[in-house]
């Protein structure tokens, strides 16, 4: 052995057919930009018939309509924001707006009545079922307990009658709920829709009115702008639309005030009779109330005429 260490032998190259052999670039192989590769790409793309048959005029009209809608929505939103900030004036009818606010509050309170009545009806339904089950359980007990059979039978009959009365009151209450839902969800809501449409028409009118005012009476130091063709006529048309909708809303509110009171008062009388009969234990009067309601027709969707 010598003191020097021999260096490790250099690894030999793997055979050419080995999978570990390095890949050599063949100049004759096609490159990414070669003619062979490009020949695989189609020279032309066929346009589908659906795309080829598109009516460009119709598309342009829809785009123009969408453009007008976008501009109008932006102007209306800007008008509402400036009104809220107190930086622009708006058309005001204090009496009409006060009536609208009163109706909105009445509508909210009717909603509370409907929700509470539905909750009461749910409780009555559960109570009637519980009373019937208790009646049945006492009857089953009377079949086995001969010594207290009379007491069990009497209690069973009492609970059965109480359960039937609860079911009868629930039937009267459900008719009352149906009538109140008609007033709440249809009659008052129909009038509120007219009020909301009136408010939208008022905003559109104020947008054009303020645009005309800003163009004809610019701030000091600014030049007068030319109005678009037909701007004044368009503003007058929107004013007429607003006035018509406001008049329709006033008529509907007046008719609603006249008819709502009479309809709701009649329903309250029927409900009061049913409640008095139930809590006084007058089963015959309660049954009479149920029979009376069964002969009544369903309330009309609305007693406000369509305008």
Curated annotation (Swiss-Prot):
Residues 23-40 have a biased composition (Polar residues). Residues 91-291 form the AH domain. Gene3D superfamilies: Arfaptin homology (AH) domain/BAR domain. Residues 8-17 have a biased composition (Pro residues). It comes from the Eukaryota. GO terms for cellular component: mitochondrion; trans-Golgi network membrane. One of its GO terms (biological process) is IRE1-mediated unfolded protein response. GO terms for molecular function: phospholipid binding; protein domain specific binding. Residues 1-42 are annotated as: Disordered. SMART domains: Arfaptin. This is Uncharacterized protein F54C8.7. It comes from Caenorhabditis elegans. The lineage of its organism: Eukaryota, Metazoa, Ecdysozoa, Nematoda, Chromadorea.
